[in-house]
Amino acid sequence: GHIAERLNSDYGFKIDEKYTDLDNYDRKTYEDFYIGSMGRRVGEAYGGVDDFTLITPKFDTDYTLYEREYGGEKVYEGNFNDAILTKSYLEEKPLETNRYAVYHGDNAELEFVNHNVEDGKILMIKDSFGLPIYCFLSTGVQEVRALDVRLFKESIAEYAKANQPDVVIILYNADCFGGTMFDFNAKQ
């Protein structure tokens, strides 16, 4: 809820508190389900196996999600669970599988259109740590566009001009801070 609070207080958004209240979400925990990024670095013996909690809205949702990469586009429509979740990440897979990718993860460009909210456009420039965040931000605004600079090779500056977001959020894991993550493929 901290990002939503800041968007409301500093940027004029009107994100309803119901979208940030955890009581308005279902939670299902999968025990001993994956090895997190630190565990993958140090090994299962040192890092252990983590639980994963899937969080989904209890309230009504209605989305169109556009997934664009490699010159193609896939369109998903329906509620949060049908349009946004990639349920194959909840199936039995190796422990090293990134379970957070269930929140429609690691694509060059995603556009979430929330048909239940009338305003608020966010452009998020992110790495894999943004996966669940853009999904949950999308519950309270009309549009979230998420770009992964590791995969998106066009000019992000031109993309922002063309799509006119109300705010741009840059969300990276601290380990990723470096020159290439701030290049934005801007044309000089």
Locate each region found by the language model.
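Extracellular glycan-modifying ectodomains
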Residues: G1-Q188
